[in-house]
Amino acid sequence: MAHTFSCSADAPLVRTTGGSVRGYRFDGLDIFKGIPYAKARRFHAPEPAVWDGVLDATSYGYVCPLLEMPKPNGEMLVPHRYWLMDEACQNLNIWTPALDDAHRPVLVWLHGG
């Protein structure tokens, strides 16, 4: 099933400590993808990510670099190996039913690897 969305003047826009972020609405949710939460600095303490202007948060950020899997079942184990990889993979994705001050449950998923 294909899904489409469009960014328009009423696309959700939020201000964060790093800068402004514009997402999109789909199926009753405000969605923000690929928001950086730290700078990629190998072997150094993390630094907050900041940006000028409005960050386009309508697509996923980079995934962390992975080694190629030489076995035939590699597709099943690492299906995202075709996604864009970069050390700047410190990003998060947010789905929320509304942009207000209501208290809502939060699910945090820390992936392995």
State the predicted function of each range:
Residues A2-G113:
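Non-catalytic accessory segments of hydrolases
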